[in-house]
Amino acid sequence: MVMEKPSPLLVGREFVRQYYTLLNKAPEYLHRFYGRNSSYVHGGVDASGKPQEAVYGQNDIHHKVLSLNFSECHTKIRHVDAHATLSDGVVVQVMGLLSNSGQPERKFMQTFVLAPEGSVPNKFYVHNDMFRYEDEVFGDSEPELDEESEDEVEEEQEERQPSPEPVQENANSGYYEAHPVTNGIEEPLEESSHEPEPEPESETKTEELKPQVEEKNLEELEEKSTTPPPAEPVSLPQEPPKAFSWASVTSKNLPPSGTVSSSGIPPHVKAPVSQPRVEAKPEVQSQPPRVREQRPRERPGFPPRGPRPGRGDMEQNDSDNRRIIRYPDSHQLFVGNLPHDIDENELKEFFMSFGNVVELRINTKGVGGKLPNFGFVVFDDSEPVQRILIAKPIMFRGEVRLNVEEKKTRAARERETRGGGDDRRDIRRNDRGPGGPRGIVGGGMMRDRDGRGPPPRGGMAQKLGSGRGTGQMEGRFTGQRR
């Protein structure tokens, strides 16, 4: 009687059960799944910051597995895909959470290519193995963008994007509580399979923008009454061709049927069903970009310098209605890493537990809707903002960590940046010279005080800096502004 050939999905499920059970029970024997021509790569970076390279052969794979120090390794399988590939092989894609040595659980993706072993029917070995942690690929921190002043064109603002922050900020933290299991594979909870996972694509290395909306105080508004209110820098999302990628798979809700229980393999594994994204506010999306001709707009409540012909009254009224009430920066909070399916009412109810929310707005990124949203929360007092900053990290829905920061003006950010450069310049100036550290004042002034110390170089008195880097060739960003 001829044995029926098993389906690729059945082979993949059985392999996943055996592999992760052995990873939990006896990881020192994990190399037996591999052959002489196998390749193995485990996510991470080396000492120089480069991704780990693959190792080849059963012996090298054995040493690599031992170097990873697997101990009490517990795995939660969220989804398994298996398809037939060349030469009667099977490619298996696994997504789940992994906890090693009692550490917090971390999301991972692992791909196996199973090849037939010799002439033995239905026997496979791992020809290729690729493992990556998601938090090493997708970062939840967002790079900060210094918003241009109101006298500059928005196109110039988009050309001066800073470098993104390191994405490996929380490499050892997880969003889930570790649940010990006996065989290393645990059936996930019902609600955990419906969690939204908004993660940006790492392959394109798209620079995220975290706009810090600049708001002037009342004195500055009186001096610049014709200056337009700063518009939210939200560009209309350009919908690219929807190509299939694993980043889009992980960003969708995964069905509970695509899990592996502790007793074996689930009866059926469904591919994730893509769900439509929640549309952002039409008011934000329909907002036109600023141009230089739109700047001279009047604001009610302040004396204008003089009317100018050619202004659109409707556009002026819409802008004034949106930005009549101005709140201090200490009452406002920047909130990043918002899920796509969130609405303003849900977010407002969440922050009402900290204080009275008087205004809230959610903005979307302009990169095809694939990046997390961000927004601003305004309280009627500065005390809730300080409580939230002290209580970080802020977990939303119990699983999504929100990136909360105090709102700062552009002038404050420039003072911090310039102050750092001048401090280093003062340290270098104080370290040189035969008299040792001389403090803030020059050597000539110390000589006048106590009659000792070397004379100033060249017979010229040293100039005292203002601490702001305002002198020629002083300050980190002086050359750039010219």
Swiss-Prot record:
Biased composition (Acidic residues): 140-158
Result of changing R13W: Found in a patient with a neurodevelopmental disorder; uncertain significance; no effect on function in stress granule formation shown by rescue assays in transfected G3BP2-deficient cells
Comp. bias intervals (Basic and acidic residues): 191-225, 290-300, 408-432
Reported effect, K408E: Found in a patient with a neurodevelopmental disorder; uncertain significance; no effect on function in stress granule formation shown by rescue assays in transfected G3BP2-deficient cells
Region (Disordered) location: 140-171, 187-318, 408-482
Segments for region (Acidic disordered region): 142-220
Domain NTF2: 11-133
Annotated stretches, region: RG-rich region: 404-476
Protein name: Ras GTPase-activating protein-binding protein 2
Gene (UniProt): G3BP2
